[in-house]
Amino acid sequence: MSRVGNRVLVVPAGVTVDISASNFVSVTGKLGKLERAFSPKVKITLQDNTLTTQRLNEEKATKQLHGTTNALLANMLKGVSEGFQINLEIKGVGYKAELKGNKLVVAAGYSHLVTLDIPSNVEVKVPKPVEISVKGIDKQAVGAFAAVVREIRKPNPYSGKGISYKGEKIRRKEGKTASK
């Protein structure tokens, strides 16, 4: 029994949801529009500003899709009404980031600058050279781009230098000790 799939999703004010016969869902809100095709094994219904999902059979794959479909719909509703934001912080001497047009340029201790193209559905801001803010309405796109930025230089467990999510607890290790 999927507890996530049985959640009733309340459609926020100012958000419209359109469901086609082929389970193609379009969600429009003040921040934009998201569209996604869902499996026909899960029935999506809209009644009185609430979205519900129901499985059409009890197969294992359908049970797995039930909770996933409900979670994806919840993320779509939140994305078009509030949006998603991930903040990253850069630690290290000489490590910094800047925006140049539609590109994010990161100096992360390499012999060269790392340049990333910013996707069209993601907005990136650099309030300080050591802070990066990734915003957007699509949770998957925001998380994927933030992960790509973090992958440039993961936090070092010995020194703590690198790019990490804001508030991320980095597991620190002790260095080598001198022998006696």
Swiss-Prot record:
GO terms for cellular component: cytosolic large ribosomal subunit. Transmembrane segments: none annotated. The keyword RNA-binding applies. InterPro entries: Ribosomal_uL6-like, Ribosomal_uL6-like_a/b-dom_sf, Ribosomal_uL6_a/b-dom, Ribosomal_uL6_bac-type. Keywords: Ribonucleoprotein, Ribosomal protein, RNA-binding, rRNA-binding. GO terms for molecular function: rRNA binding; structural constituent of ribosome. GO terms for biological process: cytoplasmic translation. It holds the Pfam family Ribosomal_L6. PANTHER family: 60S/50S RIBOSOMAL PROTEIN L6/L9, LARGE RIBOSOMAL SUBUNIT PROTEIN UL6M. Part of the 50S ribosomal subunit. This protein binds to the 23S rRNA, and is important in its secondary structure. It is located near the subunit interface in the base of the L7/L12 stalk, and near the tRNA binding site of the peptidyltransferase center. This is Large ribosomal subunit protein uL6. The lineage of its organism: Bacteria, Bacillati, Mycoplasmatota, Mycoplasmoidales, Metamycoplasmataceae. The gene is rplF.
